[in-house]
Amino acid sequence: MIMFLPLGRISLGILILFLTGGNLVSVSEEIQDRMHAVAVLSPKESTDLSLPTRKRQLLDATETGRRWPLRRRRSILFPNGVRICPSDTVAEAVANHVKYFKARVCQEAIWEAFRTFWDRLPGREEYQYWMNLCEDGVTSVFEMGTQFSQSVEHRHLIMEKLTYTKEAESSSCKDQACGPELSSPVPIGETSTLAGAVSSASYPGAASERSAASPQESISNEIENVTEQPTPPAAEQIAEFSIQLLGKQYSEELRDPSSALYRLLVEEFISEVEKAFTGLPGYKGIHVLDFRSPKENGSGIDVHYAVTFNGEAISNTTWDLISLHSNKVENHGLVELDDKPTAVYTISNFRDYIAETLHQNFLMGNSSLNPDPKSLQLINVRGVLLPQTEEIVWNTQSSSLQVTTSSILDNTLQAEWLSADESITTTTTTTISPFGFSSGPPSATGRELHSESTLGDIVSTPKLASPSKVVLSSSPEVLGGSSLTLHSVTPAVLQIDLPVAPEGRTSGSSILEDDNTEESEDVSIDVLPSSSLIQPVPKETVPPMEDSDMILLTSSPHLTSSVIEDLAKDITTPSGLDSLASRVSDKLDVSPWFPDTSVEKEFIFESGLGSGSGKNVDVIDWPWSETSLEKTTEPLSKSWSEEQDTLLPTESIEKLHMYFTEQMIEPSAHRYGDGPIYFTEEESHVRSTIPIFAESATQPTSLISSKHTSDVPDIDSYSVTKAPFLLATIANTASTKETDEVNTLLKKGMVQTEPSSPKGLDSKISVARPDMQPVWTILPESDTVWARTSSLGKLSRDTLVSTPESADRLWLKASMTQPAELPPSTHSIQLEDEVIMAVQNISLELDQVGTDYYQPELTQEQNGKVDSYVEMPTHVHYTEMPLVAQPTKGGVLSRTQTAGALVVFFSLRVTNMLFSEDLFNKNSLEYKALEQRFLELLVPYLQSNLSGFQNLEILNFRNGSIVVNSRVKFAESVPPNVNNAIYMILEDFCTTAYQTMNLDIDKYSLDVESGDDANPCKFQACNEFSECLVNPWSGEAKCKCHPGYLSVDELPCQSVCDLQPDFCLNDGKCDVMPGHGAICRCRVGSNWWYRGQHCEEFVSEPFVIGITIASVVSLLLVASAVVFFLAKMLQAQNVRRERQRPTNRQPDSLSSVENAMKYNPAYESRLAGCEQYEKPYSQHPFYSSASEEVIGGLSREEIRQMYESSDLSKEEIQERMRILELYANDPEFAAFVREHEMEEL
């Protein structure tokens, strides 16, 4: 249900009045008047949705006025984001505060507009675009609301709501004026000055207020043929309940529906309480009305909510009984609580069933709220009628409004707003002044007319004459036997201070079946100021052409004019020249999507007013509507300088070329001109004149229009064939710096002016759609216009590129050109009101989102064609996304689109399934079965709605009912906003799964993140005993258990002590030490204990002592053995060394020794010592091979023989021999002998 929150609407309006310079006093007086006017209403009327819209709006204003004093004031002087720097002056600080105020107001207004009208959050580009318009002052908040309410997307949402109703019965209009035919007075003698014709829907509240303020201006003098239809039975019943929530504390913030606490509690309450009503037959929805503080005690919160049921679900008798005795309900106990009630309820079991169900949900732990079953009260039950919407179609043959019943309008929507068809007012005769703009700001007169005029008034109050019925339907008989029927759903009021674009119009002369030409009404088009050089051209009418399947576009067969002779010609508009004038039989529509601009000096004008063929053109839908090309042309004018009465001369214009225009609204990041365009009243009763430059006569050319859309079965289509038709392309150039010529050439289907270096604006070509109006794009100074045609039989598009610096601004209307020799083409067009009830396929849209092909910049030397880019935005509809504050504009809007990731993660929670431990184990049968089930459900759903979809991987299941974490892989990079698309698909999947597969998926738990921005660990089932590690190469996340914890069968990490009960033996105690792992604490006795990693070793005290003694003894033995071994080794080494020493000495060495011993008394005194010294060696004489070389190379035997031959005794010989050996073996002794020998010498 789409509705305005009264508080948000009024508060936002007051803020904007400060921003736009409005008068707060007048607003307060108006609100007081409303409050005074509604004082006579009873409380029952204030809650009745069937009351007229005017009364309900007054009630809303009164209720809002009561809530104003409850708003909490700011606790700080300035909000976040506004700071006062010490260096700032007072003026700079004030400017900063105003800038912040504008940004905050625009942010809130944009968010509320998207949520209210389009039921979704804005994308990045569209959010930035609207921020630019709001902050630059191009559009106000109220104008923004009007534009959103006129959009096709808003009406599509309403139409989708209608398709769910079951009864298609007509209903009476009650207090609102409506009927099978709508008519409006035709002004005579006084006309309104406008710049186009359009049909649009205005802000419902504003429309009703204006009509109430000036009712006499919207009353017709003619008797209207209104057929009253009987009131059908109620199609819906709304039951209002009240229940108290225990455990909650009421706060003043719950009075504000826009507060975060209020929204959070509403979502939580609906998600919990809805379970009790889901099982009831005919249940449709539930919404919270308000929260109240309990009167008896201060604890808890009283919730006032309403539940909607189908009309046939509950009998009227039961509802009447419940309504009469709602305060006298007897508690007969809980009867058959486990069984859901049937279609007819009684007083007791209906109330008791709801109360018991809520209580059971709380006891079972399925609810976080604690509703008091005893406090449940049924306050009121009322029936609501569902009126039918009326299909208004355009009829070119008759002038009556033909209304056909096509669908049912939701009752709540009907009660809140005026329906689109009930607020239609039309004007058929106007003075159209395309150049009647003013470059200054909107005047006070324009503001007053805008705010005080009634719904049907445009500028002035004309003199009423017989009404001319507005025909908005086209039958196959009228349109030359064609099978097309176009529909229009949202006509409305013209906003005085906005640029306009045509919505629908007929050709100047309508060709009927009987070959009669119906002359159009007088339409004055004041394009340029008249001058003395203007000469009239006679009126011509083109004879009709009969074709059973074609709609002919008529024009004059030729048009000749000379620029050389006269700079301008006064051309009186013929009825057959659709390019110059037409019968305006439709409303004027505001072109809401481009910033207000003013025009200077130079422009390029493509006349196309009245070039339609009687078909109503769909209303603009800014770039998110799924439709196709639109046919229409519309001139846009500028304020012609009064100083310039003549046009600048042009060197040559070869010929006029016919255009069949198309344009898609592109978000603009710039504001052009000095001020917004607005319309002024102009008294003119003469036929319009349009100066046209032409050098040579042009031959009649054929207009071939092709409309491309997806194939839709059973949809009427039409084709446009070759017909003598001419749309004049008017090029009027003027320059403030130079008065040189501007050459306009048309070569090979291309119209071009001098190119130059680009400045500021990207060149773009847009694909238009049938629900879009042609709009005008203003280029900054120094821009060039290229009109490119195709010679290969395909329609080409216009491209905007740079122009020379000497040129002033150009007004360009993007157009399609087609050579005359091309054959006609026929394509189907999708009707605006067609509602396709199917899963929304956004695969094509995702491929086109953000696909920007940028043209290269041109220098002055480059004159070649410029590459254009095509931007196809997506139509993504998602609801209930969390509010995320997006940044405000930071300069020029960036259109750079980067390639997205190949992986997108998402998770969802299934609430009606119980989790089991086996779902942790990916190898378990239960896991595989559930995984296969979700793959079978999700893969076809995603594959059919996402282009580039490769595969879906179920990562894991987590506890929390059942949380499914998944990963989607794409074959190629996806757009950055693919998250929104997947969120929308999953949200729709939640609804489908609940209705068809009994899977209750909590859509509030949906979480979608792209691979580049997502945290892979977020979608892993890692518990507190593990940590998530991400592979930097593959991006894969994995859970790693902490030391002392293990994962068995991919279950969450658990302690080793729990997984292995026998980890510690002999009654040891297992414990996990953080960072170290599991350890065992072993038992200890008086003289024994256990030890080891798992306490597997037993240790006693005697055993330890014995081991200690044995260890010491063993150590000593080992030490002794080592010492003995070392001694032996040293001794053996000495012996070996003695044997290896040489025994040779000099020949006199022996005699010197003998002389030393013989003649040295000191030596003799020491002889006994030497004998003692050598005594140990006597037993073990040391023989060495070296001793043989000691004495002159004589061996020991030779020395002995020498001594035996002497007189020495045997003892002396032995003694000398020992001395010699000692001398030879002991270096110290040898040194001693030599020392004493030297002393004697």
Curated annotation (Swiss-Prot):
Residue spans, topological domain Extracellular: 29-1104
Hyaluronan-binding motif involved in chondroitin sulfate A-binding: annotated segments: 255-263
Listed Low complexity bias regions: 431-443
Claim: Cytoplasm is one of the keywords in the record: no
Presence of the UniProt keyword Cell membrane in the record: no
Tissue: Expressed in the pineal gland and the outer layer of the retina.
Subcellular location field: Photoreceptor outer segment membrane; Photoreceptor inner segment membrane; Secreted, Extracellular space, Extracellular matrix, Interphotoreceptor matrix
Domain named SEA: residues: 235-349, 900-1013
Glycosylated residues in this chain: 193, 225, 231, 297, 316, 366, 429-431, 817, 841, 945, 959
InterPro entries per the UniProt record, alphabetical: EGF-like_dom (IPR000742), IMPG (IPR039861), SEA_dom (IPR000082), SEA_dom_sf (IPR036364)
GO MF annotations, alphabetized: heparin binding; hyaluronic acid binding
Spans traversing the lipid bilayer: 1105-1125
Region (Hyaluronan-binding motif involved in chondroitin sulfate A- and C-binding motif): 1210-1218
Stretches with biased composition (Polar residues): 211-229
Positions of the UniProt region annotated as Hyaluronan-binding motif involved in chondroitin sulfate A- and C-binding: 1128-1136
Region (Hyaluronan-binding motif involved in chondroitin sulfate C-binding): 1083-1091, 1139-1145
Name this polypeptide is given: Interphotoreceptor matrix proteoglycan 2
Originating species: Rattus norvegicus
Gene that this polypeptide is encoded by: Impg2
